[in-house]
């Protein structure tokens, strides 16, 4: 009886000193006390709606924005995208950093203490959006739609038979690569994929290492880049790689602009070593008005819109990780800092 009363008293005191956080199918018990200081360090966009949503989901936390924030010493969690390198040394209490996107290449992880966790956003809707974009542009190249757009501007009414090319090669076989491969396969395309490490898949012919890449490139009709950006993948789409593709091949880059050596692509197109390209990402964004890509009829340009993050999905993931951090739980979607993804 005495033990039961003591247990009840303990539970009462614990619940008085805690709050419940419910997230979809999970319930967290979080100790009340000083609020956690969260810094939004995202440059190049208006963060008003993002911060308002975070405050709605995390009413007990202190949500601040860089560079207006004056209490950097208190910051424990940072939501970052292209944050300045000199920010990290001003955060002595930093415990975790979340990228605002699927990749973490905008975070200079070499400047973070080793004990700081880095996480990223994983959004199934984003993966489906990417798959639809890739399928759409593969079909556009197959059906010669860009040629018809040009002919329309010239009042040129002349039909051409669609290409028979049907083999897509994907660089990168993570969540986005797998979603694209599935969508392409369901629509009748043959799909191969290359990744740094060996993987297996029943419907996709997988390659790995440099030898595997060399074997895959001559066999494909469309090359889709979905790699994470690391020191090893920067500039991977260069003159050497492009020379290994068939002359009728098309390149679709939806990963990062730095994967592509831009002048090498222009040279390959101008010399007819490559048929066409779709580019959604660029070394400099927005793409400068005087960039030669704008005036190349063989290049289709979109403004980094292949897969746009959904505000509700992103903020829910961020809020969940902040509450997991407060509860002492392992964060979701942690990044291997050695690999960079």
Where are these regions (language model features)?
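Glycine-rich NAD(P)-binding loop of Rossmann-like domains
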Residues: 147-179, 206-207
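Short acidic low-complexity segments
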Residues: 63-74, 85-88, 204-220
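N-terminal glycine-/charge-rich "phosphate-binding" loop or analogous flexible N-terminal tail
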Residues: 1-2, 7-76
């Amino acid at each position: 009886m005495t033990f039961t009363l003591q247990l009840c008293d303990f539970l009462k005191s614990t619940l008085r000193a805690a709050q419940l956080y419910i997230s979809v199918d999970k319930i967290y018990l979080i100790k009340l006390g000083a609020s956690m200081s969260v810094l939004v360090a995202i440059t190049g966009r208006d963060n008003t709606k993002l911060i308002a949503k975070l405050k709605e989901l995390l009413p007990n936390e202190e949500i601040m924005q860089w560079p207006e924030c004056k209490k950097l010493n208190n910051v424990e969690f940072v939501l970052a995208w292209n944050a300045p390198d000199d920010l990290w040394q001003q955060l002595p209490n930093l415990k975790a950093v979340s990228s605002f996107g699927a990749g973490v290449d905008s975070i200079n992880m070499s400047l973070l203490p080793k004990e700081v966790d880095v996480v990223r956003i994983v959004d199934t809707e984003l993966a489906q959006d990417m798959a639809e974009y890739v399928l759409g542009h593969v079909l556009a190249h197959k059906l010669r739609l860009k040629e018809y757009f040009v002919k329309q501007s010239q009042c040129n009414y002349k039909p051409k038979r669609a290409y028979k090319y049907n083999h897509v090669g994907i660089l990168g076989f993570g969540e986005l690569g797998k979603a694209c491969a599935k969508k392409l396969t369901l629509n009748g395309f043959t799909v191969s994929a290359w990744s740094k490490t060996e993987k297996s898949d029943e419907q996709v012919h997988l390659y790995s290492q440099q030898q595997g890449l060399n074997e895959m490139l001559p066999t494909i009709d469309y090359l889709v880049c979905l790699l994470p950006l690391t020191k090893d993948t920067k500039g991977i789409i260069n003159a050497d790689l492009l020379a290994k593709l068939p002359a009728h091949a098309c390149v679709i880059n939806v990963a990062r602009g730095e994967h592509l050596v831009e002048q090498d692509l222009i040279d390959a197109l101008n010399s007819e070593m490559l048929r066409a390209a779709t580019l959604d990402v660029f070394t400099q964004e927005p793409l400068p008005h005087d960039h030669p890509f704008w005036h190349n009829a063989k290049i289709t340009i979109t403004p980094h819109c292949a897969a746009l993050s959904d505000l509700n999905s992103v903020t829910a993931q961020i809020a969940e990780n902040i509450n997991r951090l407060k509860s002492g739980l392992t964060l979701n979607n942690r990044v291997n800092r050695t690999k960079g993804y």
